[in-house]
Amino acid sequence: MELGLVGLGKMGGNMRERIRRAGHTVIGYDRNPDVADVHSLEELVGKLKGPRVVWVMVPAGAATQSTIDELAELLSPGDVVVDGGNSRWTDDEKHAVELGIKGIGFVDCGVSGGVWGLENGYALMYGGTEENVAKVQPVFDALKPEGDFGSVHAGKVGAGHFAKMVHNGIEYAMMQAYAEGWELLEKVDSVTDVREVFRSWQEGTVIRSWLLDLAVNALDDDEHLDKLRGFAADSGEGRWTVEAAIDNAVPLPAITASLFARFASRQDDSPQMKMIAALRNQFGGHAVESKTEN
């Protein structure tokens, strides 16, 4: 089949290559002319035969919205737009309505696999009607990993991005658990080779995972992570997961704590701990540490 692909960055560029390897035609557009096959969205749409499928792989928020707005003016009834970026699931219904007014279908798709997806395949979670999903199915089949799993029609519009959001929330908590265990192992004198402890966990243990494999890769590059500063950003999906939990009264202690740990990583000197130190000094005369004057 033919596919229009908008956004050819680290993920989009590799996805184009994987789909082409499966025998499909992909026409890609990107603001970077060095990687684009066409010079505009209008040219991309003009090169596709109907009914068209256009996959949007651009940053969530304004970039996705402006792309969908433009496609709504260019596409025809019966065409389908797939949002494969990390959009907030609450935006999906709005996009479906905007496109649906013009008879254009919409499918939201959460994509996991990162830079490894070209060779290993991408895990796909998508939401939309059976009719619209069927039009995209050959592309889903090309992108997914080999085997029976790694791809799911999660439900109606919004379900794909919601599932990907929860996936990323779980990822936050798993990374935090590995990080806490690593720090504790590094702290004690009795464990002399933390890297090899992590490596030993890769086979036969209940905590083996791809994230653990990546942790071992990182420790092979920098055994004690001395080259890194302990600063961790968050992409937004961890926050959205916690907000969804609050909206649905679902307790998420591990995921929430892992998000807050990232906030703490960005503070060189915690204002909260200053207040705690001051209060302990006030009520109990406990010692405090003063800032060193320069």
Predicted regions and their residues:
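Hydrophobic beta-strand scaffold residues
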Residues: 26, 106-107, 252
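Rossmann-fold dinucleotide-binding core
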Residues: 67-69, 88-185
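Helical "substrate-binding/catalytic lid" subdomain
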Residues: 125, 135, 158-286
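NAD(P)+-binding Rossmann beta1-loop-alpha1 motif at the extreme N-terminus of oxidoreductases
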Residues: 1-52, 78, 115-117, 281
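Structural motif
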Residues: 6, 29, 57, 83-85, ...
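Conserved dinucleotide-binding and phosphotransfer motif residues
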Residues: 22, 102, 248
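Rossmann-like NAD(P)-binding element
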Residues: 31-94, 100, 118-128
